[in-house]
Regions:
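Glycine-rich phosphate/pyrophosphate-handling loop used in enzymes and phosphotransfer proteins
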Residues: 1-130
Length: 130
């Protein structure tokens, strides 16, 4: 069940989702073509200036409201799992944050979101791979 306290229904409904997890050759996957071998790539949402998703991410990053990141991850994790996207995935690897930024902020927002995705799936989060 979604946490209405963290993300209201209106914000939840208007999150500008990419649905890239439903397209094999999506724009995120294409970014990696010729650079490295990957099996799958996707992105949860478009990040537009003035959008509510931007406000939510900023609350996570700059106000330290980690529960928002976990909740966003959980929402995306449910979409990934129900679509079958996670079927052949072994683990979730969050993008590392520069050590100085992590010291200042006290956490890596990518790891928080990854843990939310993991909470909606059976995938482990591996933070020491990259």
């Amino acid at each position: 069940m979604r946490n209405e306290y963290l993300i209201c229904t209106e914000c939840y409904v208007i999150i500008p989702r990419t649905n890239y997890h439903l397209e094999e050759n999506n724009p995120v996957a294409q970014l990696f073509w010729g650079r490295c071998v990957i099996e799958k790539a996707a992105a949860f949402s478009y990040f537009n200036k003035g959008s509510r998703i931007r406000n939510l991410i900023h609350c996570l990053k700059y106000k330290g409201i980690k529960e928002i990141g976990f909740e966003l991850g959980k929402i995306y994790g449910l979409s990934l799992t129900s679509s079958g996207f996670t079927r052949d995935i072994d683990m979730i690897i969050p993008v590392p944050l520069h050590p100085s930024k992590e010291r200042i902020r006290g956490f890596n927002q990518s790891e928080i979101i990854s843990r939310g995705i993991a909470g909606a799936s059976t995938l482990p989060v591996e933070i020491n791979t990259l």
